[in-house]
Amino acid sequence: MVPADKKQSILFLVNPKSGVSKKKRVPQMVEQYVDHERYDVDICYTQYAGHAYELAKDAAANGVDVVVAVGGDGTVNEVGRALVHTGTALGVIPCGSGNGFARHLGIPIGIKKAIEFINDAEPVIIDYGKINGQPFFCSCGMGFDAVVSSDFAKGNRRGMLNYVKKSLVDWVKYKPETYVVETESMKEEFKAFVIACGNASQYGNNAYIAPFASMRDGLISVSILSPFNTYEVPMMATHLFTHTFDESNHVTTLTTSWI
């Protein structure tokens, strides 16, 4: 912790390509709304994939107190990976397509409100998961959502509408697969449309794939969605956006420390 009478250094890392919102006003808004009595401010724009990770890692090595990811969940993941087990705190100004990390933690959507939130915030410790040796902070998945996320990441357009378009295109050609799921308490075979492992409760846009996931319990919430018929899509979407995904007959839920 930084003594109360000492200013904290804070670096805003802006991803200009995330989401659909314009970020040209970020420097002006930071200058206008940040608490300059608390923070010494620096701002940097990322220039390529992985750049946020590099800049955040350098910042932590140089003793910067707070690094703020200005972007979506991909930017948060890059910055967060660089800051795990360091003395540098992660802040977020959510400007992505879904902003699942920020929404889960109650961070306001909107640059001005998010800056004001940072002005009054104190650091807390949160969990992260690991897959293939890489940390993740919201969720990781296998199946349909992984296919859509991969296709969305490869595209140049962002926003919820484009995500829905990608989903519809992939829906037509996707075939569910069979998985062997093993945890500390079970091992079972599932034919699944999606297997989602949630550290956070939602994908973003308040789509709750793991409604009761917590970032502070040391556990992963797993939702296994079995194949379903096309006419059931509206009901599945309703469950997803009304915090009742676990109540669907097509969903098996697990809570585990590893999978």
Which positions does each model-derived feature cover?
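ATP/NTP phosphate-donor binding region
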Residues: 1-67, 187
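Catalytic core of DAGKc-family lipid kinases
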Residues: 13, 37, 61, 85-89, ...
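ATP/nucleoside-binding phosphotransfer catalytic cores, i.e., glycine-rich phosphate-binding loops
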Residues: 23, 183, 189, 214, ...
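N-terminal glycine-rich "phosphate-gripper" loop used for MgATP/nucleotide binding
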Residues: 69-73
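Short Gly/Thr/Asp-enriched flexible loops that form oxyanion-binding sites at enzyme active sites
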Residues: 74-88
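Glycine-rich phosphate/pyrophosphate-binding beta-alpha loops
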Residues: 141, 145, 196-210
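Gly/Ser/Thr-rich active-site loops/lids in small-molecule metabolic enzymes
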Residues: 157-162, 211-231
